[in-house]
Amino acid sequence: VISNRAHLLEGKKLGESDKILSPNDDVNLSQSSNDTFPTAINIAAMKLITDNTLVNLRKLKNSLNKKSKEFNKIVKIGRTHLMDATPITLGQEFSGYVSQVDHGIKTIENALDHLSELPIGGTAVGTGLNTPKGYSSKIVKYISKNSEMSFKESLNKFEGIASHDCIVEMHGALKTVAASVYKISNDIRLMGSGPRSGLGELILPANEPGSSIMPGKVNPTQCEAISMVCAQIIGNDVAVSFAGANGHFELNVFKPLFAFNIIESSKILGDASLSFAKNCIDGIKPNKKRIEKFLNDSLMLVTALNSKIGYYKACLLYTSDAADERHC
């Protein structure tokens, strides 16, 4: 295409004479699709993850952190195995979410180092055949300057062309964050269930009417939306892992699959995190009456008596109260 365009710009017609630029000797000088393709994938992924994914995950973390501080004095019943457990503050519960997202951000940041290695200059199989001396270092510096990002030469261009482990590693980091965010969104959805027949401990923002047939119904659409995004990323990771295992000898030909999935996962995780923060987390309110009712009704408060009367006597109190409750 570039060669033909140059030919036309010189006033020539396609096919009437030799081309001004040779597609092989000029346009593709010192390059192979085997090293330029993975280089382009790494650049695109770095740009998207740095400018979108990480930026919006930090916004989600900040939104959760604000709610953690806001809810710090609201004591609620904890739940393990979906059953009543000992008390916890709503703020402490949200602080766990903050930590999950924070660890996820760090996991992605750590994976950026490997992703920043560019195999450009390795040409066909990683040896650098037909490239002039210093070509790789010069072009990597040029890419870094013009992209305003920090790139470096692949430590081993054979690995950079044949394996694409940097993509597998980075997508694994995205998958880890997706699993965390799925858990967070599901907790919030369950705590907001009801309003009368569910837990109803959280009041979620009413962003839109929830039903065309049930008046007044409000659905946790933001929780559901980001859950689907997380499921997609987890599915994409299976494909990326399989692609990573399919490098044969000096080349991995699954490059289009790597590119599609790392770009899609990075984009939808960033976009969904921003939407979840703005349209759900920022507007969450505690239903204090409901929280207090569950706390006061819970028999697990008896756990605090372990150090006073012992586990077995405390267990008898629990069993007795539970039996009385069942007979009511």
Map each language-model feature to its residues.
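Glycine-rich cofactor-pocket loops
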Residues: 68-92, 119-126, 198, 202-205, ...
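Long, amphipathic alpha-helical stalk/connector segments used for oligomerization, subunit docking
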Residues: 231-295
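Internal glycine-rich alpha/beta core junctions
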Residues: 1-33, 37, 55-58, 86-240
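Feature representing long, continuous alpha-helical segments
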Residues: 168, 212, 216, 220, ...
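Strongly charged, low-complexity linkers/loops
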Residues: 289-315
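Low-complexity, glycine/alanine/serine/threonine- and acidic/polar-rich repeat/linker tracts characteristic
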Residues: 44-47, 51, 264, 268
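Conserved small/polar residues in nucleotide/adenosyl-binding loops
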Residues: 318-327
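Amphipathic, heptad-repeat-like alpha-helical segments
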Residues: 48-60
